[in-house]
Amino acid sequence: KHMNNYFSLTIEEQQQVLRAVEGHIGLPVQAIEKDLWVTTILQIVFTLPFADKLIFKGGTSLSKVGKYISRFSEDIDLAVDRSLFGLEGDLTKKQIKKLRKASSVFVREDFFMALSDAIKKYGLATLCTIEPEQDGKGDNTYPEPRKIWITYKSVIQSELNYLKPVIMLEIGARSLVEPYTMNKVKSLVAENFPAIQTNVVDSEIATAVAGKTFLEKVFLLHELFSV
């Protein structure tokens, strides 16, 4: 691994990096740490074998950009292109039901396994745990969208009530194909400390045009804070 990679630093060094960024931009260290993890997981997701079928829809929270921190309330919202399940064109009610079940099972099985493997491959398996949303009962046997939670080991002792060290991915099939653009994403640590390598992989993120406004607000946020 690169010597200066954030993830191979000691806990004390990681704390120093996060505190330095906090001093620079005034956001709490917990938020800076979570931002780095959300960025990293998003980059890893777009290396998965079916990444060409995924679109990052953003996190709805940034519409409330006045409350900077609310960026973190919903972390990674992903749409899966229905062509992955062999469905095209206008769908009947029955096909939509089939699509939702297929998507739900895909997230619980294939997506979960592929993401677990990738987290191992990039050397982060000891730093976080990953768990899929379980099947529900009756009509909700196959939750759709289905969530996956990634809990990372925070290097900060104190926890903020409104900001847990958990990243929630919400993954669902969409019946509409949305316009998207390819973007790269940068964490607040990367923005403020270019000397520290934070990317485990610098992938291109297919971002829904609606989600792009989310990314733009994130970048606006970075500009506001990195003056």
Predicted regions and their residues:
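Catalytic cores of NTP-dependent nucleotidyl/adenyl transfer enzymes across multiple folds
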Residues: 2, 13, 19, 39-42, ...
